């Protein structure tokens, strides 16, 4: 059991018989009273996000999950398929379970499969991935003064802002937590 005051973003808990990932935590403390912990929880089996309020001092069960190294191999429109790097077993995860992560997946991307009771319930991406720019406007000399950027579409369909010197066909490193450009790869 874990005290709700120690909940943090990214943790997995068991609440009302279901496995949830903590998406957001806000702690509010009232004068002379107990605190209120407001959370956003994503149900790992349905993908639905719900807001749950806890009083400080309450306890929740931490979910028993394990991580397995795997590689993304392909998708068939309904599921994304991953191969376990040790056993070579293939796992299919529905698109709805990895809605946010799918924009960073290209063939052979190394991920951690999040497992519960021997079944995959989601994936954890590396902190950054390298993706190819497939569409962007040409840069102009002198635009570097503003320090801004220009829109670009990457090979997975992800839209980000890149510096003016990045051109179509180049590979860029993208932070998977924020979706922002890091550097040219």
Curated annotation (Swiss-Prot):
Gene Ontology molecular-function annotations: translation elongation factor activity
One Pfam family in the UniProt entry: EFP_N
GO cellular component, one term: cytoplasm
Biochemical pathway: Protein biosynthesis; polypeptide chain elongation
Key words of the record: Cytoplasm, Elongation factor, Protein biosynthesis
A GO biological process held by the record: peptide biosynthetic process
Keyword Protein biosynthesis applies: yes
Main subcellular location of this protein, as a coarse class: cytoplasm
Localization (cell): Cytoplasm
NCBIfam families: efp, PRK00529.1
Family: Belongs to the elongation factor P family.
PANTHER family: ELONGATION FACTOR P, ELONGATION FACTOR P (EF-P) FAMILY PROTEIN
Function: Involved in peptide bond synthesis. Stimulates efficient translation and peptide-bond synthesis on native or reconstituted 70S ribosomes in vitro. Probably functions indirectly by altering the affinity of the ribosome for aminoacyl-tRNA, thus increasing their reactivity as acceptors for peptidyl transferase.
Protein name: Elongation factor P
Gene name for this UniProt entry: efp
């Amino acid at each position: 059991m874990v005290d709700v005051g120690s909940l943090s973003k990214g943790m997995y808990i068991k609440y009302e018989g279901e496995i949830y990932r903590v998406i957001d935590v806000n702690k509010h403390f009232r004068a002379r009273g107990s605190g209120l912990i407001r959370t956003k929880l994503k149900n790992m089996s349905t993908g639905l996000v719900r807001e749950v309020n806890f009083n400080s001092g309450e306890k929740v069960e931490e979910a028993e999950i394990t991580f397995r190294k795997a590689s993304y191999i392909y998708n068939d429109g309904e599921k994304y398929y991953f191969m376990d790097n040790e056993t070579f077993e293939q796992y299919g995860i529905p698109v709805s379970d990895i809605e946010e992560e799918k924009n960073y997946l290209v063939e052979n991307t190394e991920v951690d499969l999040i497992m519960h009771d021997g079944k995959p319930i989601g994936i954890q991406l590396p902190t950054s991935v390298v993706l190819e720019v497939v569409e962007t406007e040409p840069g102009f000399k002198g635009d570097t003064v503003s320090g801004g950027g220009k829109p670009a579409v990457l090979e997975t369909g992800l839209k980000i802002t890149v510096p003016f010197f990045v051109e179509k066909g180049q590979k860029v490193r993208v932070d998977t937590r924020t979706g922002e450009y890091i550097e040219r790869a």
